[in-house]
Amino acid sequence: MSKQTQCVHIENCNINYESIDIQLYDNENITIPNCYKCSSQDNILICLECGIVVCMEDCKLHSNHSIFKIFHGDDKTLWCNDCNELIKESTMIEKCTKNSDLINKKLKDIENLFKVMKLFIYYDQRNLKYNKNFDSIDNSIKDIIKNSNIIKNEIKIENEIEIENNKIKEFIKLIKNDKCKNIIVLTGAGISVASGIPDFRSVETGLYNNENVSKFKLPFKEAVFDIDYFKFNPEPFYQLSKDLYPSGKFKCTPVHYFIKLLSDKGLLLRNYAQNADTLERIAGIPLDKLIEAHGSFAVSRCTNCGLEYSQEYIKDSIFNNDPLKSVVPRCKVVQCNNAVIKPDIVFFGESLPPIFNQNILDDINRCDCLIVIGTSLKVQPIASMVHFFPHFKNIPRLLINNQIVGENSFGGFNFNNNKNFDFKMIGDCQESVLNLSKLLNWDTELLNLINSKNHN
């Protein structure tokens, strides 16, 4: 192709002088890109008006713009689409060329960026620690990483996890060295969520969510478990209790079986359960080791005469499919005039069952370890049990929960003091218990227990 010195079309072109840098396109370290039309890398041009990358063949289709630069070509040579010829234009070339120091710095920054990305590939995020490939990275890039807030946060998390792992190992030693022979396990709704039973207080899935409040026109969200409101209108409770009632569809979780394993090993003093779903019973935790502090669906009674009714009788009412039939179970005794039957669960406004008060003081005196699992520690008096074992008694306390709870300066958890005996495993409580059993070398026993129960 011939090269003409002048082109009449240049004066009418809208060259993007601010963004286009011809020196960058001529840099031998830059890989030739593909044509956006045909993906070819032959005779590649860059439009100096819009920046689009196109081959010589397809640039004819790019008829709106005229002037193009050839990749890795003579930096004085341009291609005019309208003239269909190569042209020489020094003035425009100079305007489209940036300071070499600036472009070299940009290229260096890009190079560093890719090295940082390379380091992230080498960075073992799963184990939260640098692996041996870190040594192969340039020292200059290591400095970039060390000054990065992101990596600083990762390293901080790594250090915190390492500290927690070391503390948990201390807790493991206490159990393995027979320092914990009378363990109290305090459990809440969180241990049954994996069974499909909603956590009362969960905003999205809990029974206290706004949808249920609106649906049943409740005066306040906790009214469904308020004893005075139940006496006034038991319908909302029984409608919502379909999600809670033991109907055979809910299975025990690893946490339930872990507590059973503690009992089998003779280490469980008591399980204080805040759940009424009876899964502790189903898991096989002995009744003499179990305090259902908030009652249980296992037994129901007439609110008038106290006659006891079976779970089957209650289920027939709750799960009936007749839209004309109430879900509220009623007493069959004629003299009771269809009095409401209430399960033996503790409503707001009711006292805890006698078995709680009969055992709590003696259990506190005998307890040598407290494990708290899956609870918000918001409901009294159960929430105060943590305070019964203050730091100065050196009784180990382990919190297994999806978030830190129960921290305060009045006998609550204090995880920031490495000298005390407070431990935590924050995350999914089922996974945490499986990890705990593995650290104790109980994982095989726990899995065997889970499998044997599930096959029965």
From Swiss-Prot:
Q: Name one GO molecular function term.
A: histone deacetylase activity, NAD-dependent
**Any one biological process term the GO annotation gives:** rDNA heterochromatin formation
Residues that hold Zn(2+) according to the record: 302, 305, 331, 336
What is catalysed by this protein?
N(6)-acetyl-L-lysyl-[protein] + NAD(+) + H2O = 2''-O-acetyl-ADP-D-ribose + nicotinamide + L-lysyl-[protein]
Query: In which domain of life is the source organism classified?
Result: Eukaryota
Q: Which cofactor does it need?
A: Zn(2+)
Keyword Transferase listed: yes
Q: Please list the residue ranges annotated as the Deacetylase sirtuin-type domain.
A: 161-443
Is Metal-binding included in the keywords of this UniProt record? yes
Recorded GO CC terms: nucleus
What role does this protein play? Answer: NAD-dependent deacetylase, which plays an important role in the regulation of transcriptional repression.
Q: Which family does it belong to?
A: Belongs to the sirtuin family.
Q: What is this protein called?
A: NAD-dependent deacetylase sir2C
Organism encoding this protein: Dictyostelium discoideum (Social amoeba)
